[in-house]
């Protein structure tokens, strides 16, 4: 979308002039490439569930004027399962829950943290309150969190005193259902001392400083900060000409401040697509600008489809050359709470799932002493964030007792699927045995996908599905 709009609307179809004006003079051109005939564009898409980054090299051929073709080459891509939903959870845990807990303590409840844990924590089991806990998150905490983020997004970044001062009731456009209110009120009334005043949930005060939120983002106290640090480091390494930022969380002042602070490219080369001016050709434009950030994906796909049929006048783009690749290069055991894959925990190196007929080294096997989460990273750098992929758990009581003693479980993985023309589809458990050579039956182990990035809770459910938002 950005490439087409710049070339056609701002440069009148003169793609050569467009490339020459934006190419960085401080980056040496590739061998055999004339200066000003290539652009290196990075994009960061911060969505609700994932943060995705791609660095693409755009090269002009030997044509001139309107008769020139753009050939893209994907240099690097990465994606992390940390994005807007995690920022919402951070806001709930940093501001909403402490405000409620403080008000409970002021009302006379001595052990407010225990009450909060029983109402909103992770019980580790499916109990009768599971549905009510989830509905509380959906009807109470998430709307308040969204209201805080919306106020932050529209705030004056130059006002050091900007903030949100309201009550829970002020921020709720729709009150929770009677069942949810009864669930909360009964538990609170039971914990209140005898003779206490009625606790009004909608009167809980909430005070949020937007400057403090920005400082927390810059200090890395938001979950989203870690993947942004990683992708900005990669973008800086590639000396990109332009950085495009899209996605609703990218509109937050704290996210914008962090990216400007990291400065993967000079600030004047960062394009925020939420404020990007488009012309009448853009089908979803709102007052000359991109309204819905999600629309850029649909319009970009439309442009690629039209380019394949040569139906874009004055814009020749070789869309067929854009292809993704697997980012699974190093697979191993993740740390318990943070998504880090240390070098000593890497099981398999230099995996290539795009290679037809790829196989894992059958000689390799690995010792286990309990349930583990397997994850992967793309780079040979232990600092690079890893992504959870599988959980390997023991579901046999006899096997668990053997391992709890002096036993060590050895496991071996293999790749499933794939042909001479296509790469493999997934990993699976090949075989397992104890250190004395006793084979372990397949039904004693469970090897399943688990791509949840947030492992701060002991449960295996996503926080929006479980409603478990309180951390002890």
List each language-model region with its residue ranges.
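Nucleotide/phosphate-binding catalytic cleft detector across ATP-hydrolyzing
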Residues: 1-41, 449-472
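Extended, charge-rich low-complexity interaction segments
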Residues: 17-35, 39-40, 45-48, 106-119, ...
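Conserved helicase motor "Helicase C" RecA-like lobe of SF1/SF2 P-loop NTPases
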Residues: 251-271
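Long C-terminal appendages of very large multidomain proteins
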Residues: 345-472
């Amino acid at each position: 979308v950005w490439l087409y709009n710049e070339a056609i609307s701002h440069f009148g179809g003169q793609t050569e002039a467009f490339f020459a004006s934006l190419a960085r003079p401080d980056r040496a051109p590739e061998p055999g490439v004339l200066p000003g005939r290539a652009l290196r564009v990075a994009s960061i898409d911060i969505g609700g569930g994932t943060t995705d980054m791609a660095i693409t090299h755009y090269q002009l051929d030997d044509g001139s004027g309107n008769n020139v073709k753009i050939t893209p080459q994907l240099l690097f891509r990465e994606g992390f399962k940390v994005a807007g939903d995690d920022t919402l959870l951070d806001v709930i845990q940093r501001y909403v829950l402490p405000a409620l807990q403080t008000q409970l303590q002021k009302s006379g409840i001595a052990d407010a943290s225990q009450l909060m844990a029983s109402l909103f924590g992770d019980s580790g089991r499916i109990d009768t309150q599971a549905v009510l806990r989830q509905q509380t998150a959906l009807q109470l905490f998430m709307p308040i969190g969204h209201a805080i983020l919306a106020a932050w997004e529209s705030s004056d970044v130059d006002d050091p005193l900007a903030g949100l001062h309201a009550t829970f009731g002020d921020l709720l456009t729709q009150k929770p259902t009677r069942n949810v209110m009864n669930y909360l009120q009964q538990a609170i009334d039971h914990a209140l001392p005898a003779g206490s005043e009625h606790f009004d949930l909608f009167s809980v005060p909430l005070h949020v400083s937007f400057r403090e939120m920005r400082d927390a983002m810059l200090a890395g106290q938001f979950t989203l900060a870690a993947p942004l640090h990683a992708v900005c480091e990669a973008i800086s390494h590639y000396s990109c000409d332009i950085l495009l930022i899209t996605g609703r969380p990218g509109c937050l002042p704290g996210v914008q401040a962090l990216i400007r602070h990291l400065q993967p490219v000079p600030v004047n080369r960062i394009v925020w697509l939420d404020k990007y001016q488009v012309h009448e050709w853009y089908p979803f434009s709102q007052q000359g600008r991109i309204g819905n950030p999600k629309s850029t994906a649909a319009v970009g796909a439309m442009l690629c489809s039209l380019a394949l049929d040569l139906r874009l006048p004055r814009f020749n783009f070789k869309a067929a050359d854009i292809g993704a690749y697997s980012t699974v290069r190093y697979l191993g055991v993740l740390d318990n709470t943070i998504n880090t894959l240390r070098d000593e925990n890497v099981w398999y190196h230099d995996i290539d799932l795009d290679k037809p007929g790829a196989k894992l080294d059958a000689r390799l096997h690995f010792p286990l002493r309990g349930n583990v989460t397997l994850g992967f990273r793309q780079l040979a750098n232990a600092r690079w964030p890893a992504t959870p992929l599988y959980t390997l758990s023991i579901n046999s009581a006899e096997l668990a007792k053997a391992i709890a003693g002096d036993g060590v479980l050895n496991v071996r993985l293999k790749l499933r699927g794939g042909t001479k023309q296509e790469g493999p589809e997934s990993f699976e458990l090949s075989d397992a045995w104890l250190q004395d050579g006793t084979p372990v039956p397949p039904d004693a182990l469970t090897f399943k996908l688990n791509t949840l990035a947030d492992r701060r809770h002991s449960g295996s459910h996503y926080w929006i599905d479980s409603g478990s938002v309180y951390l002890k």
